[in-house]
Amino acid sequence: GGKAKALKKIIKYFPEDLTEMVSPFFGGGAIEIHYAQKHKTRVHGYDLFSQLVNFWEMVLLDPERLTEEVAILKSAKPDLTEIWTQAQDTLRNTEVGQDNAFALAALFYGINRSSFSGATLSGGCSGEAYRKRFNTASIERLKNFKAPTLTVECADFEDSLSRHEPDVFVYADPPYLLEKSTRYGDKGSMHKDFDHLRLHEVMTQRNNW
């Protein structure tokens, strides 16, 4: 789940003066964004959830344009819970391209903010979440988002870690070891059959393990 509320407890275990970080399971990015914004740390974020990656890429590319798309979506569909299944299917079945990247990122944001615990494609809709989390204040925060030392790309943990030297600091927040979990990805696709043993093998090859 999200780490925003646990941020202070987590970062006390991080090195001081952290200049570079690799995050192979970016997700919501609370820890990574904190370091990119507050400490100017160079953060290399990766995730296999392609629609999530597209969202972050569009936020970093042009937050004002993305906000405009979100506003259009909210104006056209004032209550996403009424078209929930249709909206999720659109994200599942539409390939991201140059012409639709911002529109899909806006739809991802709307669904994420309107779903139980931000589960997006792995959870149901929540009218309460829609009212409290998909509102003017949240859209304004999106518009003002800045993190120039952050990048987010689509790659699995093995590929992403291989792109960086073994001594670069890694913050790894992998899927929980829950065989029946459906909390992340598309209906739990990021949880199902995740190879924790392979992750262990890859991580132990790095320096200072």
Q: How should each PLM-predicted stretch be described?
A:
Residues K12, E16-R92, K132:
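SAM cofactor-binding core of SAM-dependent methyltransferases
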Residues D167-W209:
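Conserved acidic-Pro-Pro-aromatic motif
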Residues W56, Y109, W209:
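A residue-level signal for conserved active-site and pocket-lining positions in enzyme catalytic cores
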Residues I11, L142, L161, H196-M203:
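Short amphipathic alpha-helical segments and helix-helix/interface helices
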Residues D17-M21, T41-R42, A147-T151, M203-W209:
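Short active-site oxyanion
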Residues G1-L7, P63-G185:
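SAM-dependent nucleic-acid methyltransferase catalytic core
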